[in-house]
Each structure stands twice: as C-alpha cells, then as structure tokens.
Amino acid sequence: MTMLKDPSKKYRAFPTIDLPDRTWPSKTITQAPIWCSSDLRDGNQSLIEPMDSEKKLRFWKTLVQVGVKEIEASFPSASQTDFDFVRTLIEDGHIPDDTTIQVLTQAREDLIARTFESLRGAKKAIVHLYNATSPSFRRIVFNQDKQGVKDIAVNAAKLFVKYAAQQPETQWTFQYSPETFSATEMEFAKEVCDAVIEVWNPTPEHKIILNLPATVEVSTPNIYADQIEWFCRNVSRRDSVIISLHCHNDRGTGIAATELGLMAGADRAEGCLFGNGERTGNVDLVTLALNLYTQGIDPLLDFSDIDGVRKVVEECNQLPVHPRHPYVGDLVHTAFSGSHQDAIRKGFAKQQDGELWEVPYLPIDPADIGRSYEAVIRVNSQSGKGGITYLLEQEYGISLPRRMQIEFSQVVQGETDRLGLEMTAQQIYSLLHKEYLQANAPYALVSHRLQEENGHSAVEVEVAGEGETTLHWRGKGNGALEALVAGLPIAVEIMDYNEHAIGAGTNAKAAAYIELRVAGGRPVHGVGIDENITTASFKALFSALNRSLSQQEAKAA
C-alpha cells in the first residue's frame, strides 16, 4: 500500500470551534502553571520494560528534587506492583508535606475501592477518574450513547464521595478527565463535566480538577486553545475548578498546544520529563518549564543539573534522549557552522554578568542548567575561524590575531576535510603546535643574547641550520625584534605583531604572533610561546620565517 493521491477519501480535517471573539491570541503566559508529572503512570505504562519499584522510587525522588508538587505515581488497581509502590511511598515517608501524590482509576467500583485503599494513611492525595467521551470511543469501543457515557462518569463520581468519606484523615482532591476531550463535541464534554461537578460540589476553597486531554493529538494547537477557552467560559462553577491540560504529541505540537492552552485560561499542565509517554509521548515538562524560564518567568522547577536529571530518566526509562531534544540534547548548545560560531564567540565576548542574555544562537545560558561552554562550539569541515578561535581562547588562553585566524582556519579546514571527522580543542591545539610552534627548519633558534646601549638594542642569536651547522647572527635596532630582523641574512618585512599573557601570576607565559613577508613573498604568520616575552617574540619570528621558506620551497618544487 502507498500513500493516497487523494487522502480526503480516508481522512478528514478536524472541525474548527466557532469562537469569533477568542481572546487567547492576545494573551501571554505570565506565571508557571501547576505542574503534574505523569512519568510514573502514563510514562511508565508506555515503556517496553516498565520500571521496577527501585527505579520508580529513584524517579520519584528526582521529581521531588526538581520541585514537582503533584506526581501521578501509579494505577494502583492495575497491578500489585503499582499498589505496593503507593504503599511504600506513604509508609516509608517519601512524600514531602508540600507534595501531593496522584493516582488514576477507571470508573468501576472494585477499581475505585482498591485505589482508595492504596492511599490509606496519606496526608493528602489526588484521585483521578477518567472515561472516554469522544464519538469514536462511544461507538466503537464502548457501544454506548451519550447518556450511557455520562452515567458512567456520574456514578463513579458518587463512588469517589463514598470512599473518600471512609478515610477522613486524608485531604482529598478529586480529578476528572473526559478522556479524548479534544476529539469530543464541546457541548457534550461540558455536559459530562458539569454533571461530575454537581456530584462533587466543589467550592473556591476546595476545588476539583478537570483535566482536558488531547489524548490523541488530532488538530492544530490553535483549535485546542479554542476548545480550552470555550470550555473555561462555559463550564459551571469555574471559580471552583482547576482546569488542567494533558497533551500528547502525535502531530508534534504538544508543547505549542499546552502553551496556547495556558494562554486560553488553563491553570495546570500534566506531562512527562523529556516527553516520554504513549506513542509519540506526553508533552515535555522540561521544555515547557525552560520555555518559561527563557522568557523571564520563574518556572518553579529547578533544572540546574539538567544532565543529572536526564541520566536518571534515561536509566529508568531505558530510552535515550535525542541529541537534538530542546535544552538537554547533546547537540542543542553546539555550533558547527562557521558563521554561527563567529556570532556566538562575539556574543560571549560582549556578554557581561548581570546583563540580559543576548548571545546569538543560544536562547539560554548553558551554565544556568549546569552545562559547560566546552561543547558550545565544535569544529568540523563546516566550521570557520570563529569556532577555532573560541576553542583556543577558552581551553588554552590563546587569542589569535584576526588575519592569523583566517590563515589557521584554512589549515584546520584542510585537516577536517582529510579526516572527515570533528576536531576537538586538543586536536586543534596539537595542529597549531605542529604547524607553528614546531616550525624549526631550516633555522632553529638555540639561544640569544640581548644588550641595551644608548636606547638601542644589540642582539646575537645562535641558530641551528641545515646539516647540523651552527650559525651566529648579529643585529642592532630600536628594539629587540628590530635588531633581530636587522641581523637576518634574509630580507624580512614585519607586517604585524601581537602579544598577550597566557595565565596569571608566576606561572604565566607570553604568546607572541608575527606576520611577516620574506623577499616580496606572501604574508605568513608565526607563533612563539615562552616564559620570557622577548624569547617568545624571537620564536614567533623564526616560526614565521621557517614557514615562509618552507612554503616557497614547496611551491618551487
């Protein structure tokens, strides 16, 4: 079978919502929603190999550490393992006073009774009831009409009241999800939810949660936002209801749908860390939170050690986080492109502590989430001088002059083309060392003696020449470098000179860079590094001289 030429014969567009006076497009998110993690329930049930109790407890502790205050821990009536995990959390004191455990149940009395039993002794708990309400589920799965589906929800809601009354020591919060809400007729979704509200009788002081899932994402996120705004306007007792979102990512827009849903009036968001969950996953709470953070809004979740959180999630879920995953992927703060690297390097150079973050191509400061700058710029065949320069500056304190950046980038480019691989900072430094600092033929500086007389410098250098010969060159000039040039047996024009310190204190070294031209040839650079600045400048001159002579010899051959 192949894709249809006319997909309209098999698929139909989702209907839009008639809401001409919608207000959500002109609104912005100004505060974090109530967060609820479903990693241990929705996320866990979607794993090839569900977590054992040890992994679940490790994951629970990570969620608590991050700051998630409502955590859906399990489906206690589904298995003894899930039931026992809830008991472990309660009996062993793993639920902090500011954290609420949430559990899920279907709308059957035996399952509801078992669910409440699992929570015995909890200080506070959210019990989550659901049943599907969309036309396809009513017709295909349950063979029920609207009244039948509504009755299921109402009867189960009454059982919640009954069993909660038997455990008055617990502070109960009831939650209802019209599963497949986003594919349900809005009037009917409201009708069912209103009926549940009447049974539970919430107040502004003791609210219930209505969770409105995009169980399967079926439309563009603007339609979901319209549904949420319509529902918030029309549901009864809105001041006594927390509107919660539960988006999946079937169309790849779970983040956008959730954010637009919050703009449309929702108060709460359920999801999983890094987007685990059924099929294409639940909405990613980490991305949602850091999207807020990068807009200057406190997300009320702490991802200062995002790689530590990722390690726990990957080991517990036994699923890798994609290298391009927002904020946490291995490559999301990495630039290979030369123009990107140059912009980032310049951005870092201008960025000051305490100022608004404005580094190009980096929407967040990697340091805020525990990332180093080491991987921000990496060098391959697509890279330019900016990335190479940045790595040498950051890792080795070497600041190449601009024209030398261009020259050395061509050397690196040739090496990456030859290897077909990325180059690390260490490999780039090794290439710099080989190309410039080891350029000691045909002339190698052995020693030098410098004298100052009447404001002039006199230099004598001992040089190892070809064939194990020893040469002595002498020169005078206004400075040490000019004196050395005067003593060379070859006509040399110094075109540029730069120097800087590497490090500080007694261990500091000097780096010198010379651009010169030999006998009318093309400009060539040299580098010298030494504890003594004069020696460093002499080494740089010999480096450039030898490179120029070697290039002329190679060209002549």
UniProtKB/Swiss-Prot annotation:
One of its GO terms (biological process) is L-leucine biosynthetic process. Its cofactor is Mg(2+). Pathway: Amino-acid biosynthesis; L-leucine biosynthesis; L-leucine from 3-methyl-2-oxobutanoate: step 1/4. Keywords: Amino-acid biosynthesis, Branched-chain amino acid biosynthesis, Cytoplasm, Leucine biosynthesis, Magnesium, Metal-binding, Transferase. GO terms for molecular function: 2-isopropylmalate synthase activity; acetyl-CoA C-acetyltransferase activity; magnesium ion binding. It catalyses: 3-methyl-2-oxobutanoate + acetyl-CoA + H2O = (2S)-2-isopropylmalate + CoA + H(+). Residues 439-557 are annotated as: Regulatory domain. NCBIfam families: leuA_yeast, PRK03739.1. HAMAP family: LeuA_type2. Belongs to the alpha-IPM synthase/homocitrate synthase family. LeuA type 2 subfamily. This is 2-isopropylmalate synthase.
